[in-house]
């Protein structure tokens, strides 16, 4: 018996299969000391694991360490640029905390790292930027550091070129000579529409869940797809089946021609897609 499939397009977003451009920015300024000094630190293995999980062999990737440019060195510093899925642990193990002079650790400039990545290795083309940081915003920071941190938050929240931002808070107790830390933050920034689609695909396919066991916090956008509709049935017909397509963008009604009704009364649940975190420093 012939059936009719009626589809209602909920969104024009489609899954992509072409190569993705991805950058991995690793903070190595002073506040990161315990992540580099603690012999039990899983910081570098984590980064390597993320790269191996989210990067496809044909992806274009760039791996950089960043702090803030100073008289001794420019930031960010690229340690690898090329095809994806390359084992990076040996390259990461060679990285250490940066200094701004003979006695003091380097400061941090997130905006410099992001903008430099977009304009140089990305050549202003769409891509996903991963940031590995302790997210330290200490009350003891000087006014310039506080201003730079605020500038970064403004960049990721207000700049329309950054389409999507996810945050993955992770526990990782580490101790260094001068500083201790209880955990870190991994950000995923989608620069441009193509990167937003690629990042969505990484989440929806379950690929990201292979390395991050908890659902990410959505920082941006806060006004797009906040809820998901989950069809439960058709109220006025027991023979019509309602479902969503695999990408959750198309509403599908499965019915026989002789049982077509002039009006479909859909019953559905609404799922809140925001995942709240209460993060204690």
List the predicted regions and their residue ranges:
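Gram-negative bacterial Sec-dependent N-terminal signal peptides
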Residues: 1-19
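…and closely analogous acidic/polar surface helices at protein-protein or active-site interfaces
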Residues: 20-22, 30-62, 143-157
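Residues that scaffold, gate, or flank divalent-cation-dependent active/transport sites
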Residues: 27
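Extracytoplasmic/secreted cell-surface and envelope-processing proteins
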Residues: 32-39, 71-76, 114, 137-146, ...
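Von Willebrand factor
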Residues: 73, 78-133, 137-138, 167-173
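VWA/integrin I-like adhesion module and closely mimicked acidic/polar interface patches used
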Residues: 136-191
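Eukaryote-biased recognition of long, low-complexity, charge-rich segments
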Residues: 177-234
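Extended non-globular C-terminal regions
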Residues: 239-281
């Amino acid at each position: 018996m012939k059936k009719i499939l009626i589809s209602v397009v909920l969104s024009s977003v489609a899954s992509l299969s072409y190569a993705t451009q991805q950058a991995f920015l690793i903070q190595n300024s002073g506040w990161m000391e315990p992540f580099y000094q603690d012999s039990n630190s899983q910081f570098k293995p984590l980064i390597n694991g993320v790269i191996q999980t989210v990067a496809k062999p044909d992806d274009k990737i760039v791996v950089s360490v960043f702090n803030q440019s100073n008289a001794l060195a420019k930031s960010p510093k690229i340690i690898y640029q090329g095809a994806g899925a390359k084992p990076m642990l040996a390259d990461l193990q060679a990285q250490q905390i940066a200094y701004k002079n003979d006695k003091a650790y380097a400061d941090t400039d997130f905006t410099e790292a992001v903008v430099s990545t977009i304009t140089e290795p990305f050549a202003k083309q769409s891509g996903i930027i991963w940031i590995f940081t302790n997210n330290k915003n200490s009350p003891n920071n000087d006014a310039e550091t506080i201003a730079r941190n605020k500038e970064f938050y403004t960049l990721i929240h207000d700049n329309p070129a950054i389409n999507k931002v996810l945050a993955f808070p992770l526990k990782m107790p580490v101790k260094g000579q001068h500083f201790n830390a209880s955990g870190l933050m991994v950000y995923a920034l989608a620069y441009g529409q193509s990167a937003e689609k690629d990042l969505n695909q990484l989440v929806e396919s379950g690929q990201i869940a292979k390395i991050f066991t908890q659902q990410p916090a959505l920082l941006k956008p806060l006004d797009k797809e906040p809820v998901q509709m989950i069809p439960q049935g058709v109220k006025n017909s027991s023979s019509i089946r309602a479902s969503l397509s695999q990408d959750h963008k198309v509403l599908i009604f499965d019915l026989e021609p002789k049982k077509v009704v002039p009006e479909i009364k859909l019953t559905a649940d609404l799922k809140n897609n925001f995942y709240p975190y209460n993060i204690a420093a």
